[in-house]
Amino acid sequence: MPELPEVKTVILHLKKLILDKTISKIEIFIPKMIKEISSEEFKKYLENETIFNIENEGKFIVFFLSNNKIMLSHLRMEGGYNFYSKKRQKEIHDRLIFHFTDGSSLHYHDSRMFGTFHFRNSENYLKIKPLSLVAPVPWKIDLDEFFKLLKRKKTAIKKILLDQQIIAGLGNIYVDETLFASKVHPEFKANQLSLEQVKLILKNATRILQESTKLGGSSIRSYTSLNEKEGSFQNFLQVHTKFNKPCPNCGELIQKIKLGGRGTYFCKKCQQLN
């Protein structure tokens, strides 16, 4: 699943290729991916509009268009974009195609079809679900308020860090890496963390997300950025995907468990539960 660094990398490439382009036609092959309105309404609202900016809110890609229109895109598990400067045939996993007036096109591909698209107006898009539910990213979180919130949670800290309504941008990869850097066991109860531990978790989450963004994200399993470009942060992962390999700090073999349905990697010596 693309996490915050991967989403930001996609946006960086999109900005270089499609800003100031006008949508002439939208082809929608999987209507269920368009939420709240029909696919025909979606096309009517966005065709003939110009894309002038692209940003993110958590893991959502936010396309700002002319006439105060906004399109939200969430890549979910397998979503991604390919840009073509000339006419290109539909590929097997292409689900939407945005054609531009200059003959270029942007293809959204998604083998599992979990991705979503939403239409919004700019004056209220942050106040309506799903964006109204998206929490701040780690570097924008108030430490004291976050600590108070965790004191009310008896859940494993990994599950908390994966909750986009509590803290945005972290997925399975970066939660494992953050907790390893913070020497906190993924099953450690959130309400038992000290203020210093919480501060360290936010600090490491910020550092790791920003370092990964600079390297184009982590290309493991199916993730590639725009037009199949790979990131390189996977070369610097300390524990995630490192089952039975030596811990880079102590040499103990990295463990793997299932936590909340997610494969979870940690060092039992560096990240002690008791």
From Swiss-Prot:
Transmembrane segments: none
CDD domains in the record: EcFpg-like_N
Active site (catalytic residues): 2-3, 59, 262
Record keywords: DNA damage, DNA repair, DNA-binding, Glycosidase, Hydrolase, Lyase, Metal-binding, Multifunctional enzyme, Zinc, Zinc-finger
A single GO BP: base-excision repair
Gene Ontology molecular-function annotations: 8-oxo-7,8-dihydroguanine DNA N-glycosylase activity; class I DNA-(apurinic or apyrimidinic site) endonuclease activity; damaged DNA binding; zinc ion binding
Cystine bridges: none
Cofactor(s) required for function per UniProt: Zn(2+)
Role: Involved in base excision repair of DNA damaged by oxidation or by mutagenic agents. Acts as a DNA glycosylase that recognizes and removes damaged bases. Has a preference for oxidized purines, such as 7,8-dihydro-8-oxoguanine (8-oxoG). Has AP (apurinic/apyrimidinic) lyase activity and introduces nicks in the DNA strand. Cleaves the DNA backbone by beta-delta elimination to generate a single-strand break at the site of the removed base with both 3'- and 5'-phosphates.
Similarity comment text for this entry: Belongs to the FPG family.
This protein's name: Formamidopyrimidine-DNA glycosylase
Organism: Mycoplasma mobile (strain ATCC 43663 / 163K / NCTC 11711) (Mesomycoplasma mobile)
